[in-house]
């Protein structure tokens, strides 16, 4: 992987990730394909929304279908027939979300398989081996996603262990001869001094990109913005920056304003299946009765297949009848909305008009522009 940085506007960056499998224009949003599929979508449909890279889930793909079946096909690209690049998370967040059924030690994490209850152990070395078999174009180190709230002492211990796991991840990645990219993950909760230590330690180890982890886990938005404002200027300018598990459209906008290049989140697909649809002026809850006889498109400014062909009334009807097509059409639209938003942000950065774009984005939704505390 090669990262090319074209231009900046304030702290926002316009560039691209270059892989053997294709080019990803940044800032970029990555749809989430947890089990080797973006739910309800064929790879061709995902590509048609404008997505150039997707995310797969190491933890879930390890449990099902498993490494051996994956290797029978070649790798995850061959298994799911996605031709572009794939980023896989390390399994750290899924382990974090298991809560009481896992035990974290210096060696790794002991937990029970959520499918059948069998005892399982996952550590940095195993995570690197699984992601190697998946053929991931971007591999994420294995870390502990520090929960929120966490006091300073716990956050420090967690961050320091994640740094040790980062070195173990780096060593195993290299010993496998993996020629793809490996990203480090910055931890430290909402504490700036701990984030500083994490950044310094990761940069000393050396990675192809740097992710900001441990955010969007329940902390106030102001804390997320503050940590991004503090961390991003410390990161190498020639490496991509990835905000993990984020988020709502406004979170993408605010991340870009603060220097983030990559995002992923289940929100557009999960919300689509629940009839919660993103449009230029905000959000449409298609289940509401007011859409029952509305013949207008979901979003007159959207060029997706759904908006070009179907009315709000039809989408409302599909939702009320619990038809599978409704979830699919909603997903097509939400993913296209996210990709159109990213394209708009990229164009605004190119033209040096990002803050004008941001102002219009919030004005259309009747909301104030969040403060930006950067030099």
Swiss-Prot record:
InterPro entries: ArchSynthase1/Queuine_TRR (IPR050076), TGT (IPR004803), TGT-like_sf (IPR036511), tRNA_ribo_trans-like (IPR002616)
Cofactor: Zn(2+)
Pfam families: TGT
Known function: Catalyzes the base-exchange of a guanine (G) residue with the queuine precursor 7-aminomethyl-7-deazaguanine (PreQ1) at position 34 (anticodon wobble position) in tRNAs with GU(N) anticodons (tRNA-Asp, -Asn, -His and -Tyr). Catalysis occurs through a double-displacement mechanism. The nucleophile active site attacks the C1' of nucleotide 34 to detach the guanine base from the RNA, forming a covalent enzyme-RNA intermediate. The proton acceptor active site deprotonates the incoming PreQ1, allowing a nucleophilic attack on the C1' of the ribose to form the product.
Enzyme class, first EC level, given as a word: transferase
Gene3D superfamilies documented for this protein: Queuine tRNA-ribosyltransferase-like
Annotated keywords: Glycosyltransferase, Metal-binding, Queuosine biosynthesis, Transferase, tRNA processing, Zinc
Cellular component, GO annotation: cytosol
Free-text comment on the cofactor: Binds 1 zinc ion per subunit.
Complex and partners: Homodimer. Within each dimer, one monomer is responsible for RNA recognition and catalysis, while the other monomer binds to the replacement base PreQ1.
Enzyme Commission (EC) number: 2.4.2.29
Keyword Endoplasmic reticulum in record: no
PANTHER family per the UniProt record, alphabetical: QUEUINE TRNA-RIBOSYLTRANSFERASE
Family in the record: Belongs to the queuine tRNA-ribosyltransferase family.
Gene: tgt
Active-site residues annotated for this sequence: 89, 264
Domain of life, source organism: Bacteria
Pathway per the UniProt entry: tRNA modification; tRNA-queuosine biosynthesis
Listed GO biological process terms: queuosine biosynthetic process; tRNA wobble guanine modification; tRNA-guanine transglycosylation
GO molecular function: metal ion binding; tRNA-guanosine(34) queuine transglycosylase activity
Catalytic activity entry: 7-aminomethyl-7-carbaguanine + guanosine(34) in tRNA = 7-aminomethyl-7-carbaguanosine(34) in tRNA + guanine
UniProt key word Zinc: yes
Region described as RNA binding: 245-251, 269-273
Ligand binding (substrate): 89-93, 143, 187, 214
Residues annotated for Zn(2+) binding in this entry: 302, 304, 307, 333
Name of the protein in its database record: Queuine tRNA-ribosyltransferase
